[in-house]
Amino acid sequence: MHRLLLYNFLVTTLIAPASISANSNKIPTYRAIYDVEYKNRSVGESEITVKKKESNDNYVFSSKSNATGFLKLIFPKTLIEVSEFSYLDNTIKPQIYSFSDSSITNSESYTISFNWEKNLVNTTINDQVISSEIQPNTLDNGTLQVALMLDMKNSVPESYTIRDDDGARVYKYTSEGEENLETPLGIIATKKLMQERQGFSHQTIIWLAKDLQFIPVRIEQFRDGKQRVVLNINSLKWLTIDD
């Protein structure tokens, strides 16, 4: 669950971009809690937070997932993703991204540092540093969600390129129409997207709240046509710089 749940949470994009039009240039800051199901069983919760830093104009996206029940024995620690990024001239630029997972069956962590002056990234895994080139507008798994929320104020993006420990990934999006969802927050009008990676059997359906800054309120992940992971929003709080 660990990798499927957060790597692909909103998972995860350059053709239509992290460059946002001027009338959509405010980044929502918030905290959302999601209930997580795996193969139709409740397995934990995930907390997504986007905050603005006090010290500079950067923002921080963080995602924390905790297992419950019997899975707590296998995944006793919190799975954490953190992305610090800048947002200037309507462009999102990741600065540093980290992923940490320590479970009984798997222990993995890595860090990606972005050098936009040289268009390079340094990926650190187990004290080994790998440098590689990146294209403009490349995102990470955290800034992907932020870019998607901003772009959806205008239209459905065609694709995004993200960088993770496996290199560059391109995800494509298609509209699946609109749907009203019943949630703990009430009935929410959503736009429904399909996310796919070419050549892979994974698919993700995302419901984005039209009147809540396009925050995702439901995510379903499929593998080989079978539903695997479902995230449903449970609570939402808008944040200020003092929170």
Can you describe what each PLM-predicted range is?
Residues 2-3, 127, 131, 159:
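Intrinsically disordered, low-complexity regions
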Residues 22-116, 152-243:
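Acidic, serine/threonine-rich low-complexity disordered tracts
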